[in-house]
């Protein structure tokens, strides 16, 4: 459609785009050499990434597209990637060796619903301008956030093929389902994670031949890290700590939990009597900041009362996030630093390694439903945010948002023994290459762009 021969981006161009001179990483140099040998570009594929979490899920597909013959990868960074308040995670994208083709500011980082609406408008306009200038053929979006909505709207209204990963899911978060299903109707190709999600897309009127069930891309890198753990090649993120279940907890010696968003490696010390280790990831559900703060305080109180050592990760930028952050920071100031550490963000691999090493994941992150079972980690799923998602195993304990319910769920989850690397409904860890294979071969013609209700 719009493909034409292009030269690989030079390091000088990358320096100019990022506004600073930095030596290219080895991975970046390898990618530039690979671009130089790929020959004529026949289709350009833009990935829209707005958050730390969704970038981690897109990465395996980006790698597969980059290696594909005749394919040119484009990266558009937006959303909280560009906000210092949420860790400025665009730095992680660049550190991984990806030259960022466009940076499109959306949210300003405050906690008003209006900021989300205005951010969506800015995102659509900025992404659309890039797609036109870059002559993009296919736009790839993932999930249910407004950054994905902006990419889908920009792609559809400028006549691009829109490919949507993780459509068809059901989750009772703030407006997750509303956005996800709207993105489905804007998209031309669908890559659901499960068979039931695929059937749901077809019931929405999408043609079955546009739907490709691929599994969950969140398992792609995790499957490799689990193999490393089994082979003894695992690089600990929680250092020196053997996984402990209730039966062997007394014998386990866990000297330190070294996780730090500032990457200075400051250790979180765990006393020799050996505590179970938890990761806390609690996101807002679109309610008031005061309500979200109350829920987060209940989570932290329950964690304290059960004696866990915990790593707490900042929430996403959805409405109500400021209340969660206030609760976290207040707890940090009074908590024992040997038991409680806070990070704004974590690189995807660091998060997955920590998930493998932890005894519990507490909160309402989708990684508790999808990835945790394969990591061999029990889950306390709090509140309504993930209600409706297909469970990946029997190691998930759902509970209400009171501190009594959370405390009871923690104690129940600690008695579970999930199997690392076990099979789940979310596939086998090869989602990214499956997406890339379809995007590389699907005919880019008017038939694909012209959608009709299929019932």
What are these regions (language model features)?
Residues 4-25, 32-37, 245:
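Arg/Gly-rich low-complexity intrinsically disordered repeat tracts
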Residues 123, 326-361:
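Donor nucleotide-activated moiety binding/catalytic core segment of transferases
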Residues 48, 81-84, 187-294, 450:
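A nucleotide-sugar donor-handling region in carbohydrate enzymes
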Residues 71-116, 126:
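Conserved nucleotide-sugar phosphate-binding/catalytic loop shared by glycosyltransferases and other
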Residues 414-455:
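C-terminal amphipathic helix plus adjacent low-complexity
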